[in-house]
Amino acid sequence: MGNVARRWLPLALIAAVTALTAYVIRDLPNPVAIDLRGLLPFSLEPAADTAPRWVAIVAMPALATVVWILFAALRSRLALGLTRRLYGDMPEALGNPVTVTRFRPTYDTIVLWVVTLVLGIHTGVVAAALGHVTLAPRIISVVLGMSLVAMGNVFPRLRPNLVAGIRTRRTLADPLLWRSTHRIMGVALVLAGLMTVLVGLVAPSFGLPTAIISLLVTCVIAAVGGSRSAVTSRA
């Protein structure tokens, strides 16, 4: 996929999903009833909620648009400069947008899948509104898992920057630690995503908890494994 196409694909997806949503729920009563009981392995109270039809159509696509705009703003010189101040005595070069531009295709891929995740949640909510109570958690879990796999696949390509990745003072100051941490994080994210997809298909109510727990474990594995790998490489 070309860089320009990848850059604008999130907005095209948002527009397409919004239009499709407006079409498929046009005949539903207003307000729309949304039942997400199958999303978790325990019961939610109330069992179902309602929302105005226009909210069901535009709320999550609007959030996806805000996410896309935020990612675009975060790589600006102003945002990077302000972020660098939060880290104290980090190199001034990290405030340069070039630090993001050099892995721009990877950055755009991550943005695309974050937007896809938001739209996947939206699709699950729409499915619940249409009465597909058991399908909704499967959609959300599968899209969440696929997003983790896709982002994990490109995570090792990230380079030290202030926008994307595991950005601590240690990883930003040590290129070797950055590489080892993100290599391990990428593998762990792929495994977490595959597990989330599998659980989401077989036992959909456990898909979201599986994703949350596996993400926490992934962060621990990346932090510990990355540090040990960096030490071993220096030995």
Q: Residue spans of the language-model regions?
A:
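Select subsegments of transmembrane alpha-helices in polytopic membrane proteins
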Residues: 6-14, 67-73, 105-117, 179-190
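Alpha-helical transmembrane segments and their membrane-interface junctions
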Residues: 19, 116-137, 191-210
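Active-site and channel-lining beta-strand-loop segments
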Residues: 23-58, 164-173
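Membrane-water interface of transmembrane alpha-helices
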Residues: 24-27, 65-90, 150-166, 225-232
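Alpha-helical transmembrane segments
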Residues: 49-68, 134-151, 213-214
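Ordered, amphipathic secondary-structure segments that act as subunit-interaction surfaces
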Residues: 70-136
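Membrane-proximal helix-loop-helix units in multi-pass membrane proteins
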Residues: 125-147, 154-171
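Terminal transmembrane helical module of multi-pass membrane proteins
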Residues: 162-235
